[in-house]
Amino acid sequence: MIILGIESSCDDTAAAVVSDHNTVLSSVVSSQVDVHHRYGGVVPELASRMHIEAISPVVAQAVDQAGISPDQIEGVAVTRGPGLIGALLVGFSFAKAFAWAKNIPWAGVNHLEGHIYSLLLSDDPPAFPFTALLASGGHTSIFHVVSQDRFELLGQTRDDAAGEAFDKVAKMLGLGYPGGAVVEALAAKGDPCLIPFPRSFLDKDGFDFSFSGLKSAVARYVQLNRENLGEMMPHIAAGFQSAVTDVLAFKLIHAARATGCSRIAIAGGVSANRFLASRMKIEAAKHNMALYLPPPSFCGDNAAMIAARGHRLISQGDLCQLDSDVFSRTRFL
C-alpha cells in the first residue's frame, strides 16, 4: 500500500510517500526556521499562514520525488495532534480534501506515536517491546512500547520539555532560535563540570521530568555573571547540556530496568544531539542494553514517520471521517 504522509503540527511543512509500512519513497520538509528566528520562537499565526503557502508545493514535490502519480496513492496519513491548532488544521484539511477527492481512506496520526514509528524506519529497528524516550521541543516522555499499537506512558515532563529548555537557554545566551544545535555546538567548546547546575530527578522511583529548576539556575547564573559572560558561555552551555543529559539518561535506564526491557530507544528532535547519543551508548553498554536511534533525517518532525504510523492505522481500518478534527493537547487516539 502506498501512503501519502502529511505533517504540519508546528513550524515544518512536510510530506512523504511510504510503501509497505517502512519503505520511504520520498520525504520533503519545508522549514520555517529562518522566518521564526527573528522573533526568537514560533509565532503560531505566522506558522499557519506559511503552512498554507507551502502545503501544495511540498506534497507535489514528495509525489514527484517518489516517482509515482497522485492516482497511485492508496491512502493518506496526517498529523492530528498534539500541536498548534492553526498549523494542524492546514495539513489536516488538505489531507481530508485529497482523500475525499481521490475516494481513498485517510487516518489521523498522533504526533508522538509518529515519532516512535520513526525508529521503525531504521535499517535495524528495535524489536518489541522496548522502552523509548521521546524528547523534542514540545514533549519529553518515556513510553513502554509493547507492540505496534500499544504505547504505555511511563512518565512525562511536568513543565518544560527538554528541547524547549535548550531553546530558552539559547535565548538567555543570545544565541537565537532554534537553540538545540547552537547550544550543542557551543557546549563542545566548554567544560561540562565547571558549573554544577542542579539535576532534578524528582521522585527517583518515578519517571517524570522537570527542567524548570535547571532553566532558572541557568538564568540566575547568567544574571550574576554578566561581566564575564562571553568567556563563560561555552561552559554554561556545556554544564546545562550535561545536566539535561544526566536526567534523561537516568530516567530512561531506570524505566527500562523497571519494565524489564533490554532495548532502549530515543526519538524526537533531541535524539539528534550527539552528546546525548554518546552518553546513552555508554549507559546502554554499562547496563547490557541495546540502544536504537532514528535515522538522522527522521529525528525532527517529518512526514515519513506519520505515513508509517498511518499505514498501520489504515490497514486496521482505524480511519478518520469528514467530521473528524484535530487536537492540541497530548492524548492517544
From Swiss-Prot:
DNA-binding found in the keyword field: no
Domain of life: Bacteria
Residues the entry annotates as binding substrate: L134, A135, S136, G137, G138, D167, G180, N273
Residues engaged in binding Fe cation: H111, H115, D301
Alphabetical list of SUPFAM superfamilies matching this protein: Actin-like ATPase domain
Pfam family, one: TsaD
InterPro entries: ATPase_NBD, Gcp-like_dom, KAE1/TsaD, TsaD
Gene3D superfamilies the record matches: 3.30.420.40
Compartmental location: Cytoplasm
Residue stretches spanning the membrane: none
Gene Ontology CC entries for this record: cytoplasm
Assigned EC number: 2.3.1.234
Molecular-function GO terms, alphabetical: iron ion binding; N(6)-L-threonylcarbamoyladenine synthase activity
Function: Required for the formation of a threonylcarbamoyl group on adenosine at position 37 (t(6)A37) in tRNAs that read codons beginning with adenine. Is involved in the transfer of the threonylcarbamoyl moiety of threonylcarbamoyl-AMP (TC-AMP) to the N6 group of A37, together with TsaE and TsaB. TsaD likely plays a direct catalytic role in this reaction.
UniProt-listed NCBIfam families: gcp_kae1, T6A_TsaD_YgjD
Protein's name according to its UniProt entry: tRNA N6-adenosine threonylcarbamoyltransferase
Gene name of the encoded protein: tsaD
